[in-house]
């Protein structure tokens, strides 16, 4: 039968012959007119790496169908297309992108629909084996590295697997199976601004020079961006419509400065400790000790306190996935097909700080995906065909956090945080962000 649906079909020959660097069949979608990768999205093996747009449609309304079963997570609240399972390239018989004027059996998605049909066994035994190697010796450097004179980062990826298919009972029952494993290692660099030895004691005088200023005889920086102010000395200004800063900290040195506090606060004013350094929070002081010391241009004229550290980061990941499929011909007019697919992935970034405060990784991540389908087809007449499909797909991912690598860490006894911080169930260092002149700390 024929219908008026439009799109592009990519058969087994093209799937096998076209180069796919990532070995993801969903990269083939970009061969269709009007299909592009969505901003911030990518095509790949992992769930969530199939974010694309087509002919101006919203990427969150696309659908991915495998052997008649939807593989799309519609409830992830992220506004993207998420493939719950991605089959290996060697397991795909046909890949079709449907973009307009859909047939009657398409009604789940509101945009482009990708249809994937997996391979089946035949009366002859067939098999294949492969391995693809990528590493820093064979791969070329990217354009941005070449432009900035940066050498290639060490990397290595091994992707291997095989397929097998044939008859279980000739002319009656057939099987097909495949497996693919991926082991990837990559290394890069991370740059940041970290507290210097002086700043760990409360002396932030480096900030004035970094802002292009100098201190006068009273210790005030000539560059406003390099001057620290005492928040306790803020006063209300009707012309400004709020509090304005009024008391600067001489030489940006908190360790020698004594804040007078603010007696003008309504109610009971917050009482500061007496003596120099009374603005230094003991928890923040302890947290600063978890940062590595500066290692870039230290002691030279080019030293920049806002970009004074470089370290190694990277990632390690493994992925294993397989498909099994059985076709059984009940008669010349009817057939039943069953398929089961599974993938397991593990990844972990390199801890570039070497402790629990590391910003380069969120800790180990484990992902697990299942996909299954049972399909019954009955041909009544050349123009009347019945197809019944039952499917199941599930994917979940869990990030353990950096704290799993440091089981003995206790933020209450180590940093001096309040006891209730342990009741959330996640033990880690607080997250600190800055914006609009205010500081927010959350666990």
Regions found by a protein language model. Give the residues of each.
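Short acidic-glycine motifs
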Residues: 1-443
């Amino acid at each position: 039968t024929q219908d008026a649906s439009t799109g592009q079909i990519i058969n087994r020959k093209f799937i096998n012959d076209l180069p796919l660097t990532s070995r993801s069949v969903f990269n083939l979608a970009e061969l269709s007119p009007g299909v592009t990768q969505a901003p911030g999205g990518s095509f790949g093996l992992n769930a969530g790496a199939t974010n694309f747009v087509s002919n101006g449609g919203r990427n969150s309304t696309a659908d991915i169908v495998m052997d008649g079963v939807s593989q799309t997570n519609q409830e992830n609240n992220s506004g993207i297309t998420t493939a719950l399972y991605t089959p290996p390239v060697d397991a795909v018989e046909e890949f079709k992108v449907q973009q307009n004027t859909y047939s009657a059996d398409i009604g789940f998605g509101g945009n482009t629909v990708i249809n994937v049909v997996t391979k089946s066994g035949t009366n002859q035994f067939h098999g294949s084996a492969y391995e693809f190697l990528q590493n820093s010796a064979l791969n070329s450097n990217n354009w941005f590295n070449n432009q900035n004179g940066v050498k290639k980062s060490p990397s290595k990826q091994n992707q291997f697997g095989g397929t097998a298919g044939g008859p279980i009972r000739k002319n009656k029952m057939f099987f097909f199976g495949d497996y693919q494993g991926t082991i990837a290692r990559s290394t890069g660099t991370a740059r940041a601004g970290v507290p210097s030895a002086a700043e760990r004691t409360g002396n932030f005088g480096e900030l004035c020079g970094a802002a292009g200023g100098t201190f006068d005889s009273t210790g005030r920086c000539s560059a406003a961006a390099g001057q620290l102010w005492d928040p306790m000395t803020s006063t209300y200004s009707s012309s400004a419509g709020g509090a304005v800063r009024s008391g600067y900290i001489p030489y940006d040195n908190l360790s020698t400065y004594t804040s007078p506090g603010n007696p003008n606060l309504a109610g009971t004013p917050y009482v500061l400790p007496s003596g120099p350094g009374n603005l230094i929070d003991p928890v923040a002081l302890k947290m600063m000790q978890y940062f590595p010391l500066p290692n870039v241009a230290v002691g030279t004229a080019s030293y920049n306190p806002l970009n004074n550290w470089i370290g190694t980061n990277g990632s390690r990941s493994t992925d294993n996935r397989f498909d099994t499929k059985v076709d059984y011909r009940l008669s010349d007019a009817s057939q039943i097909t069953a398929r089961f697919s599974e993938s397991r992935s593990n990844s972990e970034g390199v801890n570039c700080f070497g402790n629990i405060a590391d910003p380069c990784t969120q800790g180990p991540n484990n992902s697990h995906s299942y996909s299954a389908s049972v399909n019954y087809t009955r041909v009544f007449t050349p123009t009347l065909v019945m197809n019944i499909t039952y499917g199941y797909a599930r994917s979940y991912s869990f990030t353990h956090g950096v704290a799993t690598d440091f089981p003995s860490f206790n933020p209450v006894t180590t940093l001096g945080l309040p006891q209730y911080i342990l009741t959330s169930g996640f033990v880690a260092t607080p997250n600190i962000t800055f914006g609009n002149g205010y500081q927010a700390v959350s666990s």
